[in-house]
Amino acid sequence: MLDREGYRPNVGIILINNRNEVFWGKRVREHSWQFPQGGIKPGESPETAMYRELYEEVGLLPQHVKIIGRTRDWLRYDVPNNWVRREWRGSYRGQKQIWYLLRLTGRDCDVNLRATRHPEFDGWRWHQYWAPVDEVIDFKRDVYLGALKELSSRFLRGMESYEDFAARQSSDNR
């Protein structure tokens, strides 16, 4: 299902633990890492889609998490043509996403990447809040950064800013 502008409605999930580290999932049989995300089905609310995707990709149930917040509006990214399925070319531009910030209230052992028959991830880890940004595929990077910035500034008081994190990383690498 695409909107009039060619964007597929989608939800993204930033799952944090009690140390404000983010869940980072490794795509099945790939060397790429990402946050859980997935499409919103017709008639489904973004929140319902978020809980479905959370279970399908991470194996967590609503009782394992607490919603801290969500982005105010859709964040969009365009997918390069060479990444678009042939049958979608011409009408599909990319994804528009509502991002949720969730806190894990359960335990690490509640994560189950094989909760469904078609797992999205075959590995996972906790990562510093800002660290994944540089590892994200380039066409998604601005959306990831936008979601992390908006959600941290609105809901995680005292969190180091991305700019401070990047400056510290730069000076540490010298």
Curated annotation (Swiss-Prot):
Motif range for Nudix box?
A: 38-59
The residues forming the signal peptide are none
Q: Where is the Nudix hydrolase domain?
A: 6-149
Q: Does the keyword Flavoprotein apply?
A: no
- For this protein, what is any one GO molecular function term? mRNA 5'-diphosphatase activity
**Which GO biological process entries does UniProt record here?**
mRNA catabolic process
Keywords, comma-separated and alphabetical: Hydrolase
Q: What is its EC number?
A: 3.6.1.-
Q: What class of enzyme is it?
A: hydrolase
Q: Name one GO cellular component term.
A: cytoplasm
Query: Highest taxon of the source?
Result: Bacteria
Q: Which cofactor does it need?
A: a divalent metal cation
Please state which protein family the record places this protein in.
Belongs to the Nudix hydrolase family. RppH subfamily.
Function statement: Accelerates the degradation of transcripts by removing pyrophosphate from the 5'-end of triphosphorylated RNA, leading to a more labile monophosphorylated state that can stimulate subsequent ribonuclease cleavage.
Q: What is this protein called?
A: RNA pyrophosphohydrolase
Question: Which source organism does the UniProt entry give?
Answer: Neisseria meningitidis serogroup B (strain ATCC BAA-335 / MC58)
Q: Which gene encodes it?
A: rppH
